[in-house]
Curated annotation (Swiss-Prot):
SMART domains, alphabetized: PUA
Location(s), subcellular: Cytoplasm
Top EC group: transferase
Domain PUA: 2-81
Lineage: Bacteria, Pseudomonadati, Pseudomonadota, Gammaproteobacteria, Enterobacterales
EC annotation from Swiss-Prot or TrEMBL: 2.1.1.191
Assigned keywords, A-Z: Cytoplasm, Methyltransferase, RNA-binding, rRNA processing, S-adenosyl-L-methionine, Transferase
UniProt protein name: Ribosomal RNA large subunit methyltransferase I
Species: Cronobacter sakazakii (strain ATCC BAA-894) (Enterobacter sakazakii)
Reactions the enzyme catalyzes: cytidine(1962) in 23S rRNA + S-adenosyl-L-methionine = 5-methylcytidine(1962) in 23S rRNA + S-adenosyl-L-homocysteine + H(+)
CDD domains documented for this protein: AdoMet_MTases, PUA_RlmI, RlmI_M_like
Length: 396
């Protein structure tokens, strides 16, 4: 008989809506013992079967649902089906947009909670972020090796969230050859260098692909400031869009060095590109005091908020940085501003930008809205999957 997690009375509603999480406060009791990550059955207070899930005893999210089908077993065949289903959508996207790199598995939205897999050419980069994902590592890797014999697999499970699940960080080769120090990928006509072994996340921010492409329509003959530039994807796109100048700002010299290489790799005019190692908040104030102005500013900061207790402080940070950017824009300028904080709703982010405009003494028109690229889907039952949001703002 399988181990069962029994829900408290009335706490089954989210599962009936097919939301994939069970929080610790919804649990009445456990029937039987299971190891961290082991598969358990979830039942309501009357014993009615609801879902099959992975147990996370160290986490506030006590269980993550693998399936709502009572006849489905969690094994290699299960992971193979999920991977094949996800691949169908990515095949269409890759062909339509000419991509050789994309997010193959986007966690809960692809029916594999705690699992992130990015494909860069013939390298699969794996992040296992939950106890269940880690427990099922052998089955998942076996399914990947069978479906993608041409691909090497590299683990980037060096993410702090694993500690909340009671797990150590993990990084290194899983199978096949080691990735090169920098791997060139293609995106909307750009070649971009990716550091799989040491870069942010899995090596690159694939989720901003569509936003980078959209930048081109705003930048012709414009002076562009690219804040939190990382390896310069927005800068390369701006140069391909015909900008007059683009200044990329980041605190990491290594990232800026790769950004410069990306400009050179695409045979673009390096004299139009400047790379500044500095703190964005400090530099924006310095530019303001010096009377510098720009026609387009890209504001793509890291996540400011990890939990609800940090939300208020994050709102202040987002407002401050957007106010400074708006102050630096010429009349008729464009602000492309983003938040990758999942706890920051689109409506709240829009209000923050509006408040920033008020504080800057400028009128702003919202002219375009952005979200994560289509290989980062959001399943209807899990709206938390929409974490990246952004706006193009016309500053008057």
């Amino acid at each position: 008989m399988s181990v069962r997690l029994v829900l408290a009375k009335g706490r089954e509603k989210s599962l009936l809506r097919r939301h994939p999480w069970v929080f610790s406060g919804a649990v009445a009791r456990m029937e039987g013992k299971a190891a961290p990550g082991e598969t358990i059955d979830i039942v309501d207070h009357q014993g009615k079967w609801l879902a099959r899930a992975a147990l996370s005893p160290a986490s506030q999210i006590r269980a993550r649902v693998w399936t709502f089908d009572p006849n489905e077993t969690i094994d290699i065949a299960f992971f193979t089906r999920r991977l094949q289903q996800a691949q169908q959508w990515r095949d269409w996207l890759a062909k339509k947009d000419g991509l050789d790199s994309y997010r193959l598995i986007a966690g809960e939205s692809d029916g594999l909670p705690g699992v992130t897999i990015d494909r860069f050419g013939n390298f699969l980069v794996l992040q296992l972020l939950s106890a269940g994902a880690e427990y099922q590592r052998p089955a998942l890797v076996s399914a990947l090796q069978a479906l993608y014999p041409e691909c090497a697999i590299y683990d980037r499970s060096d993410v702090a969230v694993r500690k909340k699940e009671g797990m150590e960080l993990a990084q290194g080769p899983v199978s096949g050859e080691l990735p090169p120090d920098l791997l060139a990928i293609e995106e909307h006509g750009m070649k971009l260098l990716v550091d799989i072994k040491g870069g942010h996340k899995t090596g690159y921010y694939l989720d901003q692909r569509d936003s980078r492409f959209a930048t081109r329509r705003y930048v012709e003959d414009k002076r562009v400031l690219n804040c939190f530039s990382y390896t310069g994807g927005f800068a390369v796109s701006a140069l391909m869009g015909g900008c007059r100048q683009v200044i990329s700002v980041d605190t990491s010299q290594d990232a800026l060095d790769v950004a410069k290489q990306n400009v050179e790799l695409n045979k673009l005019d390096l004299s139009k590109a400047e790379f500044v190692r500095d703190d964005v908040f400090k530099l924006l104030r310095k530019y303001r005091d010096q009377g510098e102005t720009f026609d387009v500013i890209v504001m793509d900061p890291p996540k400011f908020v990890e939990n609800k207790s940090q939300l208020q402080g994050a709102c202040r940070g987002y407002k401050d940085i957007n106010m400074l950017a708006i102050q630096l824009l010429n009349p008729g300028g464009i602000l492309l501003t983003f938040s990758c904080s999942g706890l920051m709703t689109t409506d709240l982010f829009q209000k923050i930008v509006a408040d920033a405009a008020t504080d800057a003494g400028r009128d702003v028109q919202f002219i375009e809205q952005f979200r994560q690229a289509a290989d980062h889907p959001v399943i209807a039952s899990y709206p938390e999957g929409l974490y990246l949001k952004g706006f193009a703002c016309h500053v008057m």
